[in-house]
Structures are given as structure tokens and as C-alpha cells.
């Protein structure tokens, strides 16, 4: 027997002894009873009788991972509580929730405590003390009571108003967005172009008060009464949908929980069944008895069925971000110049963070040598990097409203279209080429209208021993202020007595994906701070790799860095350092124009 199996056997034995000594009338569950509760023979369980006039049982269940997991409890013979707060399918009680932690060295204490929590929950549910929890976890209770497996996938603004929105009716799911344009963009990004896609009206109803389960509608008439009682100005929107819909339409309920979280629930409304007299029988007319267009919405609703369905929010990832950040970034436009190992990863992080509009610019093709440290893989070799990244990112992040590739250099792009970067909120230059980036720096300071946004430069030192993120605006210190005339940085963080060989194509860069990840995070983090107004140029941040990374390649901290900013010692740290203006820099001689 394995170590973990032995630990489980010992823990189950201790719990069995505790049950026998503590709970009068308890019985061990046999395999048939375990299967009836949705468990198999790898589980252990007991029936614990509940005291009191209402009787019933509480099933104690231990899964195969016990004691390294929490005990579960389920109600038996208590149909009156099956729809009570914190009671899930088949009477399972929700106590600690996902991720609950236990003292894995004292299984009896864990079971005893959890048993007490289960009894307390039952007593509270019997007394009706937990009903406000229906609103706190509204979407979970709605999902528990769905009556149709077809989900609604939504991408909707959390606006506190009812309105007609747009729906695409697919076979596996319906997709709901604010309008047909947004719906088409999302679906095209995710699944590719399909000119046959058609869009229908759907209703988004803002509920001022979220319903409890007994008020969940099971037909369109009850849905209308719920809206009339709980939604300010939602009824005209619903009635309009009833008057204009054909066979089937989607309704999304939206409201705020007691904690302020915005939740959604779905409803499918459809006409009566087809008559069963044959395949050619006409469908019952929901407007019968009224002239066309004159049937009251209340009658139309009463004559239609509805099904509760699950809502799958395609923007649910925004809930894992700091409040409001995703919505702000959705309106930002950035350009990424250079889509190599650094630029590709930074672009991905920005899209994951919610940036809504992005242009990737790079003239080069993806080569086998970079397969181990790039967002692209072997299936993209010999393809243009910008184009391949856009094709990869679109289905991954369909929320991006605009994602374009320019398979050329930024210089060629601007010669073709001088305003190509005009509307950017931020330009990221991750080219790693002094000639190109000094030109970009001078263009920003030239007083022309081609580059109006701040520029965020990012680069690696040799063997990724350090990484730098430097934001430069139209005034103050410029890129040249910290470099010599041929692109040698004045204060490097590292020095490498043994340099990589230099061939006709330039020096070989020695680093892997793990070395690269902190640099990508460094640059993307500063980009987000700039876009959200939490930082302003000029600003420089640097990542200093762990000292063993340097030692492995024969590198060490540069004396000039130590003199200016202190000894990094063991490294592995992020630091913010000044980027002072150089009075002798040529930027002092260039005209500067501030664009509003």
C-alpha cells in the first residue's frame, strides 16, 4: 500500500471511531448508497441522523484524497431544504467553498468542525436566516436551476439600463453583444470570417432587485411579471422583443449583488410547440384572435414558453483584474514596433490585460532559432512575425476590437502613411536596434505630427542579465540622453568579459524563455501604468537578473551601476532609476512641439 493510501486508511479509521462515539444511530454507507449519492467505491461515507421534529439525514462523505481534502456533507430525506441557500445538487452543502484549507494532520478535528458547520447551516436555512445569500451568489443559484443546456455567451457593458442588444443564434451557443458590429467582430476574431452570420434582437433587462429562486421564471408570462416588479423601464424593452421576435429570442437579466458585483442570467423565449398532427401542421399562432401587430405584449408573453439557461461571460476575465482597469484599457490604442521574442510576449501580456486596439509592426520572418523563446512556434517558421502573431492572437483574445499586422518596418510604414501612428496612446519600441530607435527618438522630438504619443523603449542587456523599460515623452530627457553616439549605454547594469561571437548578422543573443519572462513583465507593466495614467515619462525601470544567471555566463554587476545605484548583490529585483537629461544631448537643439 502506498504512503498516501496508508494515510487515508488511518484517517478514515479515526473518523469512523469518532462517528461511532459521537453520533447516535449513524450507519456506514455501502457502495450502492454511495453510487446513489453520485460517488463511487473509492469514497467512504456515513448516514448521520438529524435530530429534531423534521428529521432527515446528513451524509458525511470522504473522497479518495482525504485527509488532504475537506469532508463533504449532503442532505437526505429533507426535500424542504433542497432549494435552500447553500444547498446544491443532490442536497450537497456548500460549506468552505472551493480552495478551503484543512489541518491535514488532524482529520477528526476537521470532520468535527465541519459537522458543526453543517448543522449550523441547516438550522439557519430552517429559520429562513440566509435568504439574502441568494442575491450575493445569484448567478450560481440560477445556474443550478437551468432548464435548457444551450448557453448564452455574452460580451455586454455593465450599464444599469435595459435595452435591446444583438444576438447570433448558433447551434452550440448564442452570442450576445451590444450591437451587430461588436458581435460580428468578436465572432470573426474567434472563429474566422463567415459572411452568412445573421443577427437578431435580444433583450438586456436591468433588474433593480435580484429574484430569489421561487421567482425564477419558467415561462415568458412569469418573466414579464418579474420585469414589471423588479425593473425600471425594462418592461417596454421586453414587450418590444415580444412584439418583434420570430421563433426564439434571448433575454439577459443583469443586476448588482449586495456586494456590488454585476451578475447575469439567461432566458430563452420561444413560441408554442409544433402541433403533433404531422410534419406539415402549421405552428400555433401566438397572435391568434388579434389583428396582425395588435396582440398585447402580455398575451404574447403568456403564449410563449421560456427556459432558464446559463450565461457564460466572455469578459469574465475582467473580474480578475483591478476594478475598472480592463474597461479603461479596452479603449486604448498601442503600436508594438518589433515582434521578436521580447515584443511578441509583451504584446500578448497587453492583450491579456485588456488593451483593445493594437498594431504589430515587424518586417522580419520567424526563424527556427527562436522557437524556444518566442510566442510563435515551429508552425510559424518562415512566416512574417507580425502577421503570424496577429493570426494567433485573434482567436485567443477575441475581445480586441482591432488587431492589425504591418509586415514592414515602421520607417516604411510612415513613408506610406505618415499618420499611421498618429492616434496611438502609446508606442512600444522593442526593436533592439540603435539606428532605428535613435531615428524614432529624433522623429518624436522633431516638431512634426507623425509621433504624438509617448514611446516606451525596451531592451535586454547581454544574456538577459538585465532588462530596461524606458518611457520618453515629447519633453524632458530623450533616449539619446542616456546613450553615446553609437548606442552604448552610459550606465549599464552588467558587464561580460566573455562576449558572444559577432557574425555578419550581428551578435548572437544567449537567453531562454525563463530569462525573458521578467523582462516582458517589466515592460508590459510600465506600459499599463502609462496607459492608465499611473506613470508619466521620462521614467525608467530595470530588472536585474539573479546573480547566478550572470555568474553562469561569466558576467557581473557593472562598476558604473554600483557607483550610481548601489550594489545589486544577489540580484533578482526590480528597480526604478533616474534617466537624467543630458545638457550636451542633441535633443536640446531640436524643436519641440506639444500636441493637444
Residue positions per predicted region:
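Strand-helix-loop interaction patch of compact alpha/beta domains
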Residues: 1-57
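A structured beta-alpha segment of the ubiquitous adenosine-cofactor-binding alpha/beta core
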Residues: 389-425, 431-434
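Compact alpha/beta protein-protein interaction domains typified by the UBC
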Residues: 34-99, 108-112
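Glycine-rich phosphate/adenylate-binding loop
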Residues: 143-297, 422-426, 430-596
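Domain-level detector for trafficking modules
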Residues: 87-98, 103-144
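Glycine-rich phosphate-binding loop and adjoining beta1-alpha1-beta2 segment
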Residues: 363-399
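Glycine-rich adenosine-cofactor-binding loop
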Residues: 322-365
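N-terminal charged helix/coil linker that caps or initiates catalytic domains
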Residues: 273-334
